[in-house]
A protein has these predicted regions:
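Conserved "HGTGT" condensation-loop signature of ketosynthase/thiolase-family condensing enzymes
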Residues: 1-137, 168-247
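Short, high-confidence coil segments that cap the C-terminus of an alpha-helix
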Residues: 78-80, 160-163
């Protein structure tokens, strides 16, 4: 018997996605198979981050640069928003590089190690934006976006007016021949400003996901914005189904 596990609602007042590739609106609407097939042919994009001093820019990894480019102007002067960051991979390429250095050189850079942990990226954001509000870093495998929005909803229920949600992924570099591994077609950072409201209603049920596979729910969300979809489903990491309703 199908059972509702949880349900909640929220508004998304602003959002922006930044990738290391340049996609047109029509590219976004075509979906994951198209992105995967054409990932090598999309033009490269490198954020300039002109709002940061050169010394501060140099400290940021490629993943961090995408996050800053997506979120910086989105929050404008609201520098002290609580942040929920979600990623399955986070700084996975830095981690593999560190493992290689440890095996071949027997030593690690303390700075590189400190920047390899899961919450390092959002820690850099907090430092450079002087965020003193609550920050959360989580990983939920298949449904990072949904769980991040649920965490934001709980913060709103505690009295916050807005929450910055950031979902970011960078695929493992091809030079690391690891199996099994799911590689996204490109690196991306999706930033959303979340508020209380009924614009989006999400419901998690224990039914099996029987539709065409959704390999990244954040990218699926972006695709559905370009298609003006009002209802869709995404898989939950524990085997359930998220049903989205956009009002």
């Amino acid at each position: 018997m199908t059972k509702t596990i949880c349900q909640f609602s929220c508004n998304i007042s602003a959002w922006k996605i930044v990738c290391n590739k340049t996609l047109s609106d029509s590219d976004w609407a075509l979906g994951y198979t198209h992105w995967q097939k054409n990932s090598e042919s999309f033009p490269d994009f490198v954020p300039k981050l002109e709002f940061l001093a050169p010394l501060k820019r140099r400290r940021l990894s490629d993943s961090a640069r995408l996050i800053f480019e997506a979120a910086w102007n989105l929050v404008e002067e609201k520098t002290n928003l609580p942040v929920v960051y979600a990623s399955a991979n986070s700084e996975i390429n830095r981690n593999f590089s560190l493992w290689h250095a440890l095996l071949t050189e027997g030593d690690l850079s303390p700075t590189s190690f400190s920047l390899s942990v899961h919450n390092a990226l959002i820690g850099q954001w907090s430092e450079l934006r002087q965020v003193k509000a609550e920050t959360t870093a989580l990983v939920a495998n298949k449904d990072n976006l949904e769980i991040a929005l649920l965490e934001a909803y709980l913060l709103l229920r505690e009295g916050e007016k807005q929450v910055l949600v950031v979902v970011a992924e960078s695929p493992l570099a091809l030079e690391y021949n690891a199996h099994p591994v799911m590689r996204q077609p490109f690196s991306y950072a999706l930033a959303l400003v979340v508020e209380a409201g009924e614009q989006y209603q999400l419901s998690l049920s224990n039914s099996a996901f029987e539709m065409e596979p959704v390999l990244d729910s954040a990218l699926e969300w972006v695709k559905n914005q370009h298609l003006n979809c009002t209802q869709w489903q995404t898989p939950n990491s524990m085997g359930g189904v998220w049903t989205w309703q956009k009002n």
